[in-house]
Structure formats: structure tokens, C-alpha cells
Amino acid sequence: MRNYELMIILDPEVDERTVAPSLDKFLSVIKTGGGSVDNVDIWGKRRLAYEINKRAEGIYAVVNLTATPDLAKELDRQLGLNEAVLRTKLIRPDAH
């Protein structure tokens, strides 16, 4: 098991009250695979440094989790398939 930090930028048109439940739906991949979600920090709507898909803002969320590399890759893949997710970045903070 490795520690990961996942940053997710969601479409700003998503209702901010539904961000946490939709993240839980994705994070269930980690929980069912034997990993753990250590912390979920929703930053809210922020201005982007540059436009992504003609959007100037996004809803930021940072998730700290512990999982196997395969589970982390599967989570990143599923997030990439969702249209409400503008961008994701998955890193290992202990490796940098």
C-alpha cells in the first residue's frame, strides 16, 4: 500500500452540495479494493490559471488516500471518464 494525493478539478456548474456525495461514489473503488481514504478536503470554487474546456473556474478537491498502485490507476481512469471532472492529478507525496 502506498500513500497518494489526488487533486480533482470539477466542472463549476456542478452544485457544490453534490460534490462530496459524487466524490464518495468514486472513492468507493478504493474502499472496496482494500485501500483507505484518509482525508477529503473540498476547497470550493476557484479561478483556474488557464481555461479548461472553455471554463475559467473549477471546484477543487484534494483527497489523501492509501491504496495499491492498481487501485489508484483504476480510480484515476474512472475519474477521467466522467464529464464533470475537468482535470485530475495523482501523485505520491512521499516520492517527491
Swiss-Prot record:
Signal peptide: none annotated. Pfam families: Ribosomal_S6. Keywords: Ribonucleoprotein, Ribosomal protein, RNA-binding, rRNA-binding. Coiled coil: none annotated. It comes from the Bacteria. GO terms for biological process: translation. GO terms for cellular component: cytoplasm; ribonucleoprotein complex; ribosome. The keyword Thylakoid does not apply. GO terms for molecular function: small ribosomal subunit rRNA binding; structural constituent of ribosome. InterPro entries: Ribosomal_bS6, Ribosomal_bS6_CS, Ribosomal_bS6_sf, Ribosomal_S6_plastid/chlpt, Transl_elong_EF1B/ribsomal_bS6. Belongs to the bacterial ribosomal protein bS6 family. Binds together with bS18 to 16S ribosomal RNA. HAMAP family: Ribosomal_bS6. This is Small ribosomal subunit protein bS6. It comes from Beutenbergia cavernae (strain ATCC BAA-8 / DSM 12333 / CCUG 43141 / JCM 11478 / NBRC 16432 / NCIMB 13614 / HKI 0122). The lineage of its organism: Bacteria, Bacillati, Actinomycetota, Actinomycetes, Micrococcales.
